[in-house]
Regions:
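Juxtamembrane/interfacial segments around transmembrane helices
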Residues: 43, 65-71, 120-123, 139-148, ...
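Primarily membrane-embedded glycan-assembly and transfer machineries that use lipid-linked glycans
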Residues: 1-56, 81-198, 202, 271
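Hydrophobic transmembrane-helix microenvironments that flank and shape a buried ionizable site
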Residues: 30-32, 65, 248
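Alpha-helix initiation/capping motif
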Residues: 22, 74-80, 107, 206, ...
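Voltage-sensor/pore transmembrane module of 6-TM cation channels
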Residues: 52-82
């Protein structure tokens, strides 16, 4: 966990952070997927941004974008840091480098065909799939195909709305909460989300919880999400036919709470 979070017992918090996410990491590894890697790279990128080490930070973000396209959403974090032209330049540099790396093993025409196929797939599957996302849950409850583009736009506006509090941008806890909400949003509003994807969202929940002092309602919510996503799911999936939808409801709750927390004023800390 990035050290920007205020903490009194760093070692204990670090241990609890990874225990909280370990179940979803194990599921991701068993499924042979890269979601845990994406989550780790985004956390590393944030840590390097906090230390003003922009070259590795932008590299990690671009790598996540090439693995999972939504990883490019972490570029949003650039608004919090100085030297934005340098951040933009480094990002474009890494995009160019990674986009051309496959030329080591394929021809330019083959690479162009791969990118065209990638674009076709991305543009074509948005209308076909809902996955374990908010769209999937809404569709299963209503029996209708929800307007994904509209709902995605609304959710994006709601997530970005707290950024109008410019006076909080200098607070480490605020930047950490923005990252937490971004990690959760990437999953619950991703039409291709599946069970292994939730390691990313669970990292967001952990970042939210360890962003400042907590009270019993916060602890209960954390345990509720942990049990619903990482524990109960594996036990009841054989009993409830739509058990895959359960994890979304818990992540949705944590996402709404993260938005609420942005209106609070924890003790301010400065770098």
């Amino acid at each position: 966990m990035p050290r920007c979070a205020p903490c009194q017992a760093w070692t204990l918090q670090q241990f609890l952070f990874f225990v909280f996410a370990s179940f979803e990491c194990l599921l991701c590894l068993q499924a042979q997927q890269t979601n845990a890697l994406v989550a780790a790279l985004l956390l590393l990128a944030f840590a390097f941004l906090e230390r003003r080490k922009y070259l590795p930070a932008t590299l990690f973000i671009v790598i996540t974008g090439f693995i999972k396209l939504f990883g490019f959403g972490a570029i949003l974090l650039f608004i919090f840091y100085p030297q934005k032209p340098k951040l933009a330049l480094y990002t474009l540099l890494w995009i160019a480098v990674l986009a051309l790396v496959p030329l080591v093993v394929v021809s330019p025409s083959e690479l162009w065909g791969i990118y065209e196929a990638w674009q076709t797939q991305i543009l074509g599957d948005h209308a076909k799939y809902a996955g374990m996302s908010f769209f999937g849950m809404l569709g299963s409850f209503s029996g209708m195909n929800p307007p994904k583009t509209l709902l995605l736009g609304i959710s994006l506006v709601l997530m970005l709305l707290p950024l109008i509090q410019i006076q909080k941008w200098k607070q480490p806890w605020f930047r950490q909460l923005v990252l937490a909400a971004l990690l959760i949003w990437m999953v619950i509003f991703n039409h291709k989300a599946e069970s292994p994807s939730y390691v990313i969202a669970m990292m967001g929940v952990a970042l939210w919880f360890f962003s400042g002092p907590r009270h019993w309602p916060d602890v209960l919510l954390l345990l509720f999400v942990f049990a619903g996503v990482s524990l109960l799911f594996s036990d009841i999936t054989q009993v409830i036919s739509k058990g895959l939808r359960l994890s979304l409801s818990f992540e949705g709750t944590s996402f709404l709470l993260a938005l609420e927390l942005w209106q609070r004023h924890p003790p301010e800390t400065t770098r």
